[in-house]
A protein has these predicted regions:
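Catalytic nucleophile loop
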Residues: 18, 32-49, 158
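Non-catalytic peripheral regions of patatin-like phospholipases
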Residues: 4, 53-90, 112-114, 118-124, ...
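Short beta-strand scaffold segments in enzyme catalytic cores
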Residues: 107-113, 142
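A short alpha-helix-loop-beta-strand transition element characteristic
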Residues: 68, 95-106
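Conserved small-residue
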Residues: 11, 21, 41, 109, ...
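Helix-rich "cap/lid" substructures immediately adjacent to catalytic or cofactor-binding pockets
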Residues: 1-35
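ATP/pyrophosphate-binding catalytic subdomain of soluble kinases
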Residues: 125-126, 132-170
Length: 295
């Protein structure tokens, strides 16, 4: 049994792939000794460190498009569209808050100090305060203000915090990056059917927008300009490109022992109603990565 220091990237709903990656690690006898996560990686990592990943996944399996919208406390402020508190409170109903230092597995979450332009690592205090700071995507979530500091999404500076893992317990570093470059084909996923694949391909190619799709589609539909060029969709695209480049740089600087790289454009950042599809894909990619190491 090998001990793992696990690093989980930011990436919105794409981060649901982290669930399957963890499941495959455990299935193959790896023991996760520590976790550091950013944004969605902080959510999944925190749930696992609390021993509640299965409960979190079960809850996510109840999420549909209507429920996504019900969890978004939308407010058209100058610096954000969603307050973010309803999501956290809903998660607390499934997994109660706990102090990070009391978790059975060492855990750290990464956020960004907006004024200083520095990464901030949460290693103690409220688990949900750390998660809320780490997921505060600019222009989408209300920034977190605490102790005179304004916290925003850790993905701005450090979407794949490999540098933090060097001080965490574990014999090998395993990283899951859901903002990878390149292309992949969902037809490789044995649990997908042809109709699902064709629908996703069409959606990706045409970037069709409608209120019935995702929260991003809904928010975009409220803006007056063309959906592909309004300020919100453009800012999110810029943010995603920045995250992708920073993650690639971290991989180059701090090479993990095992890397799972999932192309950014394979899943949308707001497809939270596809937990089974995305987590299954993450499990498949982890299986492939472990097979390559074993060989």
């Amino acid at each position: 049994m090998r001990d793992v220091a696990l690093v989980l990237s930011s990436g919105g709903a794409r981060g649901l792939a982290h669930i399957g990656a963890i499941e495959e690690l455990e299935a193959q006898g790896y023991r996760i000794r520590s976790i550091v996560g950013c944004s969605m990686g902080a959510i999944i990592g925190g749930m696992y460190a609390a021993g509640k990943l299965a409960e979190y996944k079960e809850w996510m399996q109840t999420i549909d498009k209507k429920k996504i919208l019900s969890l978004l406390d939308i407010t058209f402020s100058l610096d954000h569209l969603v307050k973010g508190e309803k999501i956290i409170e809903a998660m607390k109903d499934i997994v109660p808050d706990v102090k990070i230092e009391d978790l059975p597995i060492p855990f750290k979450a990464v956020a960004t100090d907006w004024e200083k332009g520095q990464e901030v690592v949460f290693s103690k205090g409220s688990l949900y305060e750390a998660i809320r700071a780490s997921i505060s995507m600019p222009l989408f979530f209300d920034p977190v203000k605490k102790g005179g500091t304004t916290f925003v999404d850790g993905g701005i500076l450090n979407p794949l915090p490999l540098n933090i893992s060097k001080d965490m317990p574990g014999d090998i570093v395993v990283a899951v990056n859901v903002s990878g470059t390149g292309e992949d084909n969902e037809n490789d996923n044995e649990n997908d059917n042809e109709n699902d694949n064709e629908k996703r391909k069409t959606k990706t190619k045409t970037k069709t927008k409608s209120k019935a799709q995702t929260a991003l589609d809904f928010l975009s539909s409220l803006l007056p300009d063309e959906p592909d060029v309004n300020y919100f969709t453009m800012s999110q695209r810029l943010f995603r490109l920045m995250v992708q480049k920073n993650a690639a740089l971290n991989i180059e600087l701090y090479k993990p022992d095992i890397l799972v790289n999932i192309p950014m454009d394979l899943f949308g950042p707001f497809e939270y109603d596809h937990v089974d599809k995305i987590s299954t894909y993450g499990r498949k990619k982890m299986r492939e990565a472990l097979k390559n190491i074993d060989n």
